[in-house]
UniProtKB/Swiss-Prot annotation:
Family: Belongs to the UPF0213 family.
GIY-YIG domain segment(s): 1-77
Descriptive protein name: UPF0213 protein FN1575
SUPFAM superfamilies: GIY-YIG endonuclease
Taxonomic lineage from the root: Bacteria, Fusobacteriati, Fusobacteriota, Fusobacteriia, Fusobacteriales
Signal peptide: none
PROSITE patterns documented for this protein: GIY_YIG
Length: 100
């Protein structure tokens, strides 16, 4: 079953990364302070990037990896998503698709 990996911009400029079956519903939860603990204290302002993954395990694995990145590397994923996808496909031998 497909899952989405999403990246949100917060009011303070930070980037939140998460996983959901329905990223738009989850985005609404983040906006209404019903989302993650982090987004309750760091107000979400917009969706920056969304990727479609073939499974929850792939999405969660990528989420965990991205959360360890420094901000500059996260910004590169947002600004150059095709490079990120190419790297993931070459290194991890998995397919993901840019949605937004």
């Amino acid at each position: 079953m497909a899952y989405y990996l999403y990246m949100l911009r917060c009011e303070d400029g930070s980037i939140y990364t998460g996983v959901a079956k329905d990223y738009l519903k989850r985005y609404e939860e983040h906006l209404s302070a019903k989302g993650a603990k982090y987004t309750k204290s760091h107000k979400v302002v917009k969706i920056e990037r969304v990727f479609l993954c073939d499974s929850r395990s792939i999405a969660c694995s990528l989420e965990s990896e991205i959360k360890k990145y420094i901000k500059k590397k996260k910004e590169n994923i947002i600004s150059k998503p095709d490079s990120f996808i190419k790297d993931i496909e070459n290194v991890r031998k998995i397919k993901i698709k840019k949605i937004f």
